[in-house]
């Protein structure tokens, strides 16, 4: 561990009362060790008149488990007024210290740290050196020969007052022959007069700048050089060394020695508590066991956070930095003594496994734990402390109930009865908001979250009221589920901006139901995120916003408004990915649902027709499935349009479509309508096979409908008007040129019944024979409805030549001629 810069008297000391200079000197003495020094612990040591001022700096441990080597750097006074050993000896030293205080302050006022001569003392091969003038005031290379400790651990400037504790087995108490250490004196073991004379002989005449190279001193003496200008006799120094010392502090702490077979040693220094950056459980919140010594009857463990702001008084000293050694049973132990944290981990792991909780995935945390903490295993004598790592949200320092660590939210509960159904699943997956509510208590309130937060999480701030009884857990993340009772006002969705609605493909829906629960829900986003909303009868009917046509086209949706005269509505809108649905519970106050007038190109592109079926009673069974998955549009329809239908074919008629007789008729008619176009162009069928026309089902049905009409007229003996029938057929075939039929072969267009009104004919057999001749005739120009698209049509055959077929999808987009 690196050494600390010692707090020496090498700097210029201001006269008593000059606090500004005192503070500047303190900063100079401390150096760059700002991170380890607290401003509240820095005190002035300007003179003896400031007996209550002290400078105590302990730099030890510093985040390492090895306490074998450290420096105690201190200077000045220490408050030992409560120590009974001090009071008996304080009066004897107060007078002598006071008499010399003024002289010390003035003699040391004009000194410069760079003028100090080098000094060196040794004790059993251990060297203590100070700065040398030849090195520009820098610390020379140290020659510390400490058993079991590397030299590099003692690197640093030790020209100031410092104490090295090389051996924890043998503790000695060293003296300081310095009158400026004006603390309340304490009865300590003092050096003999002989040792003091050796100190004098070693340093020579300090005031003259001479240094003795005597290295035979057996006691490690660290001389404060602020007294170097004083010429004192040996008896004077001996008298001072007995009475005017800075106290030596003891530390009581358990640590592991890494360099000596990891054997445990006991170090005891009485004074302040342990540092606050010591291997510690910084994310703790309960009352901690004491590791620091007691100060004025109070022990303050600085590593553990105390949410209750209470000092643990009289608690036992429980070590928390043992290095574990696992045994066969899985409980880490050190010399047969389990660590508190390891014992707690083991116990909680056993209980979590017994309750089928997930195993903890954190070294010292239990993200899935929420159960009662295990007993303290007898390690705490008073059994008053909670786990040091547990959060204590109710500010009770001695709460033994295990609280969730910071990985989870700590939600306090009250008035819980029955099964405990509260669950919070934080993260990804099945995060849910489940709220069981009654009408007996005040409503929980969500905080007023900012709009950008709501936008980022795609959630709406939904206030609730009159919630109590069952636990209402709200899990933040993806997914809200809220069940409301009828005792409070209905929840309101906020007025989300239009851009938000557009981005998520949802509309701001408000629903109302006169009685009973509502089944309306809004599911948007990914997965099973839903907004079930309980509605009252105080709000208007839900309305979908007027979304632009481009949005509807992109999502394959239509703006649907539904209503039902009785019972709930079964209309739903499913869009996006998966089973996301829009379900709306409707009342009888709204008009019937209507399909919008979608563009014909949209219908053709999706392979669906705008279908409306007439059903005077019962739900509608018409559905539209498009896109991916099970996205459906069940639509309640009215009877405002006639329903398109295919000809009703019996089995014999369907078989007739594949007969040679119908093929001959269809081929002849087809060739007359589309001359030069082979319907079997790329069919690959051989001549040996029956050359069945590769007409679409719709075209074959249309041709058959015409055929059946002709046959029926023949059997009736009706007078068929060939010209009118061909004109009607021409109009039907021209419809195949339209963009609607060419885009997808929609049944809405192609399945139109060829209502060829044929009047009168004596011989029906002549109809088919004369069909090709009649098709070649010129028909009168049909100007109405054609002027806007065609300037001139000299030959109606152009329309027939451009009629659509399965292999002529790129024909012109002409509208059907009006007759």
From Swiss-Prot:
Region called Disordered, residue ranges: 1-46, 83-160, 181-249, 409-447, 469-497, 509-548, 561-594, 614-645, 777-819
UniProt feature, compositional bias: Low complexity: 232-241, 427-442
Q: What residue intervals traverse the membrane?
A: none
Which Gene Ontology CC terms are recorded? P granule
Query: Which regions are flagged for Basic and acidic residues bias?
Result: 17-36, 783-794, 806-819
Q: Where in the cell is it found?
A: Cytoplasmic granule
Q: What happens when the gene is disrupted?
A: RNAi-mediated knockdown results in sterility, and in P granule segregation defects. RNAi-mediated knockdown increases the sterility phenotype of meg-1 vr10 and meg-1 vr11 mutants from 15 to 100% and from 4 to 93%, respectively, and results in a larger proportion of under-proliferated gonads than in the single meg-1 mutants. Simultaneous RNAi-mediated knockdown of meg-1 and meg-2 results in defects in P granule disassembly in the anterior cytoplasm of the P1 blastomere causing some P granules to be mis-segregated to somatic blastomeres.
Where does this protein have compositionally biased stretches of type Polar residues? 83-128, 135-146, 410-426, 469-489, 516-540, 614-641
Keywords from UniProt, A to Z, are: Developmental protein
- Indicate the secretion signal residues: none
General function of this protein: P granule component, which acts redundantly with P granule component meg-1 to promote P granule segregation during embryogenesis, and germ cell proliferation and differentiation in larval stages. Together with phosphorylated meg-1, promotes the disassembly of zygotic P granules in the anterior cytoplasm of pre-gastrulation embryos. Together with dephosphorylated meg-1, promotes the assembly and accumulation of zygotic P granules in the posterior cytoplasm of pre-gastrulation embryos. Required for fertility.
Recorded protein name is: Protein meg-2
Q: Which organism is it from?
A: Caenorhabditis elegans
Gene name?
meg-2
């Amino acid at each position: 561990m690196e050494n600390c810069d010692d707090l020496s008297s090498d700097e210029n000391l201001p006269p008593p009362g000059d606090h500004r200079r005192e503070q500047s000197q303190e900063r100079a003495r401390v150096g760059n060790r700002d991170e380890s020094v607290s401003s509240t612990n820095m005190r002035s040591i300007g003179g003896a008149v400031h007996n209550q001022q002290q400078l105590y700096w302990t730099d030890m441990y510093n985040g390492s488990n090895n306490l074998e080597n450290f420096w105690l750097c201190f200077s000045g006074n220490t408050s030992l007024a409560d120590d009974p050993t001090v009071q008996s000896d304080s009066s004897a030293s107060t007078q002598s210290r006071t008499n010399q205080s003024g002289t010390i302050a003035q003699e040391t006022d004009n000194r410069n740290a760079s003028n100090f001569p080098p000094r060196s003392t040794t004790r059993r091969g251990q060297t203590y050196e100070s700065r040398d003038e030849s090195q520009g005031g820098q610390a020379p290379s140290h020659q510390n020969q400490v058993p079991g400790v590397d030299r590099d651990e003692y690197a640093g400037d030790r020209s100031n007052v410092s104490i090295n504790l090389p051996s924890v087995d043998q503790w000695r108490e060293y003296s300081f022959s310095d009158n400026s250490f004006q603390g309340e004196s304490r009865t300590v073991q003092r050096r003999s007069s002989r040792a003091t004379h050796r100190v004098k002989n070693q340093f020579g005449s300090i005031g003259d700048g001479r240094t003795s190279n005597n290295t035979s001193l057996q006691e490690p003496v660290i001389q404060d050089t602020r007294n170097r200008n004083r010429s004192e006799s040996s008896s004077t120094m001996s008298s001072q060394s007995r009475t005017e010392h800075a106290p030596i502090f003891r530390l009581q702490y358990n640590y592991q020695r890494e360099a000596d077979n990891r054997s445990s040693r006991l170090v005891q220094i009485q004074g302040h508590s342990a540092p606050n950056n010591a291997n510690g459980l910084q994310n703790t919140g309960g009352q901690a066991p004491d590791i620091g010594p007691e100060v004025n009857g109070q022990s303050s463990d600085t590593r553990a956070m105390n949410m209750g702001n209470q000092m643990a008084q009289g608690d036992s000293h429980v070590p928390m930095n043992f290095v574990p050694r696992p045994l066969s049973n899985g409980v880490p132990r050190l010399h047969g003594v389990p660590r508190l944290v390891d014992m707690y981990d083991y116990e909680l792991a056993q209980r979590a496994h017994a309750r089928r909780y997930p195993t903890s995935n954190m070294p010292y945390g239990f993200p899935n734990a929420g159960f009662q903490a295990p007993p303290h295993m007898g390690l705490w004598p008073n059994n008053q402390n909670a786990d040091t790592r547990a959060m204590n949200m109710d500010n009770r320092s001695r709460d033994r109930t295990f609280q969730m660590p910071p990985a989870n939210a700590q939600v306090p509960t009250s008035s819980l009865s029955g099964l405990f159904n509260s669950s919070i699943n934080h993260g990804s997956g099945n995060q849910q908001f489940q709220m069981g509510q009654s009408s007996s208590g005040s409503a929980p309130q969500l905080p007023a979250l900012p709009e950008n937060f709501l936008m980022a999480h795609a959630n709406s701030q939904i206030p609730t009221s009159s919630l109590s009884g069952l636990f209402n857990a709200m899990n933040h993340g993806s997914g809200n589920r809220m069940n409301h009772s009828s005792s409070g006002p209905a929840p309101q969705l906020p007025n989300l901006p239009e851009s938000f609605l557009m981005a998520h493909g949802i509309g701001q829906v408000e629903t109302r139901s006169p009685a009973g629960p509502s089944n309306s829900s809004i599911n948007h986003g990914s997965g099973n995120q839903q907004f079930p909303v309980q509605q009252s009868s105080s709000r208007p009917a839900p309305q979908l916003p007027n979304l632009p046509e481009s949005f509807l086209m992109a999502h394959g949706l239509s703006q649907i408004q539904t209503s039902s005269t009785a019972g709930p509505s079964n209309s739903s809108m499913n869009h996006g990915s998966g089973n996301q649905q829009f379900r709306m519970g409707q009342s009888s106050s709204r008009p019937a649902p209507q399909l919008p007038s979608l563009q014909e190109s949209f219908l053709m592109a999706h392979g669906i027709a705008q279908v409306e079926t007439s059903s005077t009673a019962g739900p509608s069974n018409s559905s539209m499935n498009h896109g991916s998955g099970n996205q459906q549009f069940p639509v309640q329809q009215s009877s405002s349009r006639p329903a398109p239908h295919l000809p009703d074919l019996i089995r014999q008629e369907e078989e007739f479509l594949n007969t040679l007789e119908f093929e001959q008729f269809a081929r002849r008619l087809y060739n007359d309508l589309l001359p030069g176009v082979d319907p079997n162009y790329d069919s690959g069928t051989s001549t040996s096979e029956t050359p069945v026309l590769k007409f679409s089902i719709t075209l074959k049905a249309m041709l058959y409908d015409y055929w059946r009409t002709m046959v029926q007229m023949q059997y009736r003996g009706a007078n068929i008007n060939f010209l009118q029938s061909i004109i009607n057929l021409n109009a039907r075939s021209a419809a195949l040129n339209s963009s609607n039929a060419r885009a997808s072969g929609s049944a809405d267009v192609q399945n139109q019944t060829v209502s060829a009104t044929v009047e009168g004919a004596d011989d029906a057999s002549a109809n088919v024979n004369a069909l090709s001749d009649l098709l070649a005739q010129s028909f009168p120009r049909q100007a109405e409805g054609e002027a806007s698209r065609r300037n001139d049509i000299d030959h109606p055959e152009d329309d027939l030549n451009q009629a659509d077929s399965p292999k002529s999808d790129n024909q012109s987009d002409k509208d059907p001629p009006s007759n």
